[in-house]
């Protein structure tokens, strides 16, 4: 009593303003000298505070000292103040109650702390401090990191529930059973209110940790009440008014017995629930959606005794993964245009309110162009046309995520759809929010995809002419007279029978003539940046005396240096060309006489091929001649040689006769070192193979050296060329005689 009276005097001293001498004055209304003396003593012990009290921030060391003292001495502010020397008693008291308010704000209603129950409150505060130490964070900084804050709150709730279950189990193991008198009083109290046959649950505000007191008759304090919770009905009753201290102690003993009896009933119900948990889960799955339309929780709709404490805690501690999908394509495209991801997956606790999910979506997508109207959630099977036939959840819904999950049938994958909608004038029909941009349907998307596939197939089909590739953009190079097609379709035009080599992407070369398609020989040459003429002209120069080919050199790559080379298999290209032409007749395929191209020049560029063609008939030579009478020296195109190979010497073509006969009319020009375009100075060339009229010409080499089908016999030509180079001395004279005839 003396401590309470001293505390009352302190409060009165703080309320009375200071006098002129700085001493607090206390009005003694009862004119009691003892009261005045005790008040003066309290005033001298605790001087008046300053008008503006500054509550300094608590450092980590001060908080550690506070919780260490709280663990040792409990709720004793004077002893705690002696441990925390940098703070006074008022600051310690303020910190204690401020922490209680903060924890009640963060915890749910089932775990609210009562400051009148210091044992549970102190235990919860110590749990709070241990978790702060675990996460290495101050309480004032928790909200700055939402993820860590969420984990912190969940861990705290789990620990408090665990402590509460442990205390209940401890009391049960001690054998504190409910007396018959206590059960009779509870049953008669319920029977008076017509609640005898209904299951009920007792919730005591100050009954978790009640000290054992001596016997006696009891009555309650003002403010202590016994709440009877019957589903949604709560009744508060107060037993007795006033009385003596011994009656209060007797009531607390009865209250203790009642709590123990309720614990026994709860344990029995838990055991019964575990035996029939499968059946109850099936019943909850079969519940229709109309049961939850009133907004009641599934746990509150059933009786309180049907749900054990452990199962309820398991339900609340579980997690749900919610996948959100847009209600239609308009919403999806609008969010994607605003650089938002229209598909989200959220991890929620079971008791997370569905309205919190809507608030999160509004904060995330509130600036989007489609965020007009009210954001609603629907079941996953809802569509834009049938939204009025389905359930919906708004920001006013107070259901939890677990309840919504039960309403949609508790699927294995929890999915909902969202959309922005407005109500019409009557408020009964929901119409979708109109959007400014047109939204193509799913069929339009399928048509676009199908069109892209058709375009891809067209580019990979047969050989296309210039007219059929209208989407290609052509760039003309006047210096060489070439048309390089580079457009959407960068793949070579091939026939249906062609073998398609792997991983080839070659830019085709077209004729200047728009109506002429690419010939098969040109297509074979376009598969690599090494031309057929270059290949044949460099074979003799690179063969060693032992017949072993050294590594390939750069050669005459300047003719196609502008063509990108991405083919990784030249053997596959040759095989495709042979497969294309092996079944065709050996009739000669004349070239188009309306245009000249790089490939016409390269067909006669090879010096060896041209010299061997001197054996052939003049009609066969004329068939492979380039049109328009372009001047050539040893099969070289004069325009390209003069433009690109100045270091190899210039050529003076002769205009004596037929254009194809101009270059080889003087065979000594070809044999002179330094002037051969392909660098074949070391190769022995005969003086003239034409007039010798050898039998080998007509019987062995005539058919092989005809460039039939525009290089159709490519493989035979290569084999014959190599064979002819090795047997070149069979046709000529002695080496000295040949050198005497050379200029």
UniProtKB/Swiss-Prot annotation:
GO cellular component, as recorded: nucleus
UniProt biased composition (Basic and acidic residues): 488-499
Localization, UniProt: Nucleus
Alphabetized InterPro entries for the sequence: Cramped-like, Homeodomain-like_sf, SANT/Myb, SANT_dom
Tissue expression pattern: Expressed in flowers, roots and leaves.
CDD domains: SANT
Record flagged with keyword rRNA processing: no
Domain of life of the native organism: Eukaryota
Keywords recorded for this protein, A-Z: DNA-binding, Nucleus, Phosphoprotein, Transcription, Transcription regulation
Region span, Disordered: 486-523, 626-679
Positions of the SANT domain: 53-104
Subunit structure: Interacts only with active kinase forms of TOUSLED. Interacts with SNL1.
UniProt note: domains: The Myb domain is not required for TOUSLED binding.
Protein name per UniProt: TSL-kinase interacting protein 1
Organism whose genome encodes this protein: Arabidopsis thaliana (Mouse-ear cress)
């Amino acid at each position: 009593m003396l401590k309470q009276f001293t505390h009352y005097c302190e409060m009165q001293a703080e309320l009375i303003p200071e006098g002129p001498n700085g001493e607090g004055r206390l009005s003694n209304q009862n004119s009691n000298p003892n009261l005045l003396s005790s008040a003066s003593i309290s005033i001298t012990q605790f001087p008046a505070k300053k008008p503006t009290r500054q509550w300094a921030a608590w450092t980590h060391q001060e908080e550690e000292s506070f919780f260490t003292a709280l663990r040792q001495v409990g709720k004793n502010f004077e002893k705690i103040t002696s441990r925390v020397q940098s703070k006074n008693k008022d600051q310690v008291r303020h910190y204690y109650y401020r922490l209680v308010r903060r924890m009640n704000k963060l915890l749910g209603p089932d775990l609210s702390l009562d400051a009148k129950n210091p044992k549970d409150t102190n235990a919860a505060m110590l749990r709070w401090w241990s978790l702060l130490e675990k996460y290495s964070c101050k309480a004032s900084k928790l909200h700055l990191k939402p993820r860590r804050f969420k984990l912190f709150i969940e861990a705290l709730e789990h620990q408090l529930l665990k402590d509460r279950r442990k205390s209940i189990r401890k009391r049960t193991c001690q054998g504190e059973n409910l007396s018959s008198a206590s059960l009779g009083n509870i049953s008669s109290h319920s029977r008076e209110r017509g609640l005898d046959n209904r299951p009920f649950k007792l919730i005591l505000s100050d009954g978790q940790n009640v000290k054992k007191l001596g016997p006696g008759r009891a009555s309650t304090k003002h403010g202590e009440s016994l709440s009877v919770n019957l589903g949604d009905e709560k009744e508060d009753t107060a037993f007795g008014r006033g009385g003596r201290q011994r009656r209060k102690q007797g009531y607390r003993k009865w209250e203790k017995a009642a709590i123990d009896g309720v614990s026994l009933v709860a344990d029995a119900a838990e055991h019964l629930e575990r035996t029939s948990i499968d059946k109850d889960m099936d019943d909850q799955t079969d519940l229709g959606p109309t049961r939850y339309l009133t907004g009641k929780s599934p746990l509150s709709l059933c009786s309180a005794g049907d749900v054990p404490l452990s199962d309820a805690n398991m339900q609340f501690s579980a997690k749900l993964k919610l996948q959100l999908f847009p209600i239609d394509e308009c919403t999806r495209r609008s969010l994607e245009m605003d650089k938002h991801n229209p598909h989200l997956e959220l991890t929620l606790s079971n008791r997370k309110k569905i309205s919190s999910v809507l608030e999160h979506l509004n904060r995330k997508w509130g600036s989007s162009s489609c965020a007009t109207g009210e954001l609603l959630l629907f079941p996953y099977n809802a569509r834009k046309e049938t939204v009025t036939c389905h359930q919906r959840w708004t920001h006013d819904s107070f259901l939890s995520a677990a309840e919504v999950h039960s309403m949609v049938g508790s699927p294995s994958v929890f999915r909902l759809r969202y959309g922005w909608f407005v109500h019409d004038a009557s408020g009964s029909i929901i119409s979708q929010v109109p959007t400014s941009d047109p939204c193509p349907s799913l069929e339009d998307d399928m048509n676009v995809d199908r069109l892209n596939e058709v375009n891809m197939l067209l580019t990979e089909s047969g050989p296309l002419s210039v007219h059929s590739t209208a989407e290609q953009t052509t760039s003309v190079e006047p210096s060489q007279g070439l048309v390089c097609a580079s457009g959407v379709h960068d793949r070579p035009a091939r026939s249906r029978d062609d073998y398609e080599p792997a991983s080839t992407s070659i830019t085709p070369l077209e004729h200047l003539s728009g109506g002429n398609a690419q010939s098969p020989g040109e297509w074979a040459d376009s598969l690599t940046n090494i031309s057929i003429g270059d290949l044949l002209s460099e074979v003799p120069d690179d063969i060693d005396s032992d017949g072993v080919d050294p590594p390939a050199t750069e050669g005459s790559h300047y003719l196609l240096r502008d063509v990108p080379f991405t083919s990784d298999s030249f053997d596959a290209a040759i095989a495709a060309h042979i497969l294309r032409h092996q079944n065709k007749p050996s009739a000669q395929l004349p070239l188009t006489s309306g245009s000249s191209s790089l490939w016409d020049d390269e067909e006669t560029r090879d010096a060896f091929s041209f010299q061997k063609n001197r054996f052939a008939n003049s009609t066969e030579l004329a068939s492979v001649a380039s049109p328009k009478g372009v001047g050539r020296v040893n099969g070289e195109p004069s325009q390209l040689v003069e433009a690109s190979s100045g270091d190899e010497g210039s050529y003076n073509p002769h205009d004596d006769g037929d254009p194809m006969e101009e270059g080889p009319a003087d065979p000594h020009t070809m044999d002179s070192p330094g002037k051969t375009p392909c660098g074949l100075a070391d190769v022995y060339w005969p003086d003239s193979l034409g007039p010798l009229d050898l039998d080998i010409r007509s019987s062995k080499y005539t058919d092989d050296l005809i460039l039939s089908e525009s290089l159709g016999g490519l493989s035979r030509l290569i084999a014959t060329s190599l064979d002819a180079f090795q047997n070149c001395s069979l046709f000529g004279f002695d080496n000295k005689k040949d050198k005497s005839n050379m200029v």
